[in-house]
Curated annotation (Swiss-Prot):
Its main location: virion. The N-terminus is disordered and is involved in binding N(0). The region of interaction with the L polymerase is necessary for transcription. The hinge region is highly variable. The central domain is involved in oligomerization. The C-terminus is basic and essential for binding the N-RNA template. This is Phosphoprotein. It comes from the Viruses. The lineage of its organism: Viruses, Riboviria, Orthornavirae, Negarnaviricota, Haploviricotina. The gene is P. It comes from Isfahan virus (ISFV).
Length: 289
C-alpha cells in the first residue's frame, strides 16, 4: 500500500486527474437531481418510423391545406325538424279504387286494391274470396249475375236458364266435382233449345247449325283456328273445351244461347281475360280445322 501511495505521489498528472474526476462526479450529480424533478417516462425501443419523428407530429393546423370556411346557418330547427334530412319520402298514397286495368306487353293486367285497414287474417280472407270467384267464373256467367247484400256478406245469384245435369246453388260451389265424361253428351229437353237462328248463321260459313246444345256437344272438342294479323305469325289454334275450361263448362255456356261460332269464341276469350291480347295479334274470324 505504501508503494502504491508512493507511485501516486510521483504521478505528474495526479492533481489534474483528480480535479477532472471530481468535475465529472459533480456533473453526474446535477443530472441525477434534474432527472428526479422531471416526470419519469418509460423508454421503449424505437422500432417504428412514427417513433423516430415524434417531434414533427403536432396537433396544430396543417399549413398544407387551406382553412375550411365556416358555414353560417341562421335557421334554427326545431326538434321535430332537425332530422328531416334523414327521412325517406314515400309516394303519396293513391285513393282506393276497386279495379285498375293495364295493358302490358299485349297482356291485360287487372289490379285489385285491397280494402283499407285490413288485418293480416282479413287480407287472406279477401284473397281467398277473389280466388274463389275466379274459379267459379268458368261455371257461371258472372257478368249476368245479380249481387245482393246479406248479413254475412254478398250473395251472387245466377241470372240464366241452367241446363240439365248442372247445379248452380251457391253453397255447393266449393265442393264442385268435375262431371263424368258421359255428362258431356247429355241432351237437354227440347224446351231448353233455341229455335231462333242467329244473325250470322253457321250454314253461311259452311258449318252445321250450332243453335242447339246437342250440336255444340259435337263441336266443343274440334280444333278452331284464327289467322294472325301479321302473316309471319302462326295461326292460333284451340278448342272450345280449352277456351271454357272443360267440356261441361263449354256446353253449359253455349247451350240454348243461339250464338254463332265467332260470338262463342269472343265470349270464351273474354272469360279467360285474353280477348284484348288476342284481338291485337289475331283476326277474330274463327273456322274449324
Amino acid at each position: 500500500m505504501s508503494r502504491l501511495n508512493q507511485i501516486l505521489k510521483d504521478y505528474p498528472l495526479l492533481e489534474a486527474t483528480t480535479s477532472e474526476i471530481e468535475s465529472m462526479e459533480s456533473s453526474l450529480a446535477d443530472d441525477v437531481i434534474t432527472s428526479n424533478d422531471d416526470e419519469i417516462q418509460s423508454v421503449s425501443p424505437q422500432y417504428y418510423l412514427r417513433d423516430m419523428f415524434k417531434a414533427s407530429i403536432t396537433e396544430g393546423p396543417d399549413d398544407d391545406f387551406p382553412p375550411v370556411p365556416e358555414v353560417e346557418n341562421d335557421i334554427i330547427l326545431d326538434d321535430d325538424e332537425e332530422y328531416d334530412g334523414y327521412k325517406v319520402d314515400f309516394a303519396e298514397a293513391r285513393p282506393w279504387t276497386a279495379l285498375t286495368q293495364k295493358n302490358i306487353d299485349g297482356r291485360m293486367n287487372l289490379e285489385l286494391m285491397a280494402p283499407e285497414n285490413l288485418t293480416d287474417a282479413q287480407y287472406k280472407q279477401w284473397v281467398e274470396s277473389v280466388s274463389s270467384i275466379m274459379t267459379i267464373s268458368r261455371q257461371i256467367r258472372l257478368h249476368q249475375a245479380e249481387i245482393m247484400d246479406t248479413s254475412s256478406g254478398l250473395l251472387i245469384i245466377e241470372n240464366m236458364i241452367p241446363s240439365i245435369g248442372r247445379t248452380s246453388e251457391f253453397k255447393s260451389i266449393p265442393e264442385h266435382i268435375p262431371p263424368s265424361p258421359t255428362s258431356d253428351h247429355t241432351t237437354p229437353p227440347s224446351s231448353l233449345r233455341s229455335d231462333t237462328p242467329s244473325q250470322t248463321s253457321s250454314s253461311s260459313m259452311g258449318l252445321p247449325d250450332v243453335s242447339s246444345a246437342s250440336d255444340w256437344s259435337g263441336m266443343i272438342n274440334k280444333k278452331i283456328r284464327i289467322p294472325p294479323v301479321v302473316s309471319s305469325k302462326s295461326p292460333y289454334e284451340f278448342t272450345l273445351s280449352d277456351l271454357y275450361g272443360s267440356n261441361q263448362a263449354a256446353l253449359d255456356y253455349l247451350s240454348g244461347s243461339g250464338m254463332d261460332l265467332r260470338t262463342a269464341v269472343c265470349s270464351g276469350l273474354k272469360q279467360r281475360g285474353i280477348y284484348n291480347r288476342i284481338r291485337i295479334q289475331y283476326k277474330i274470324t274463327p273456322e274449324f280445322v
